[in-house]
Amino acid sequence: MLFDKSFKKEKIKFDNSEINFLHGGKGEALLLIHGFPQTHTMWHKVAKELAKKYYIVCPDLRGYGDSFKPTGLKDHSNYSKKVMAKDMINVMDYLGLKKFYVAGHDRGARVAHRICLDYEEKILKACFMDIAPTYHMFENTNQAFATGYYHWFFLIQPDYLPEKMIGDDPAYYLKEKLKRWSDKDIAFEEKFDDKAINEYIRCYDEASIHGSCEDYRAAASIDMIDDEKTRNRKLNTPLLVLWGEKGFVNKTYDV
């Protein structure tokens, strides 16, 4: 098992959605939100240790893992970060957790940012990992960004083009993304547990491929509209922001 037996798996339905999540531990609540192309499984190496001090909640975002994977609407609004943030709040409310810490990586950090904007009163402290602001990244697109983050522009293409191309060999695409984003000096097999990789592959079905594409389509459309409204608003939440020393964000942006 990737997670300790003390973690309980649940799936709850609400607001025309269904979110899969694991939870367990003791102490104040800590919501952990994964990125692309992973699922809640990405936290398996740290969850047990964190659970000694915190009550851990690890959901699958909509469109990912074993959560709800709806067909994207024309305006992609059902994959907006506002909607994803509401999903996370619904999970925490279901568990009776009115105030909590939140940490997110990659796409999960963008959802965590939206949670801090829309539900500031619920957040004790936040941690964003490996992101720069979406609006800033699109607004300052250059060759380095377009090359390093080519998937931002590939996954948003319409008419199921990326879905069909990725769907030809999902396992290859998923593993290649993880390889390219991780330390080149460490062998792939040393960085990733085989069970975790197999779980990512199991979840990366046709619906999940579409869901992740819709996540990025929303980022380039409805999320930009929402971010424009709040782009000059500073968070009052105590915040820790982290980047990988060898990662793209640290090398590319003034962070």
Where does each model-flagged region fall?
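Conserved HGGG/HGGXW glycine-rich cap/lid loop of the alpha/beta-hydrolase fold
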Residues: 22-70, 91
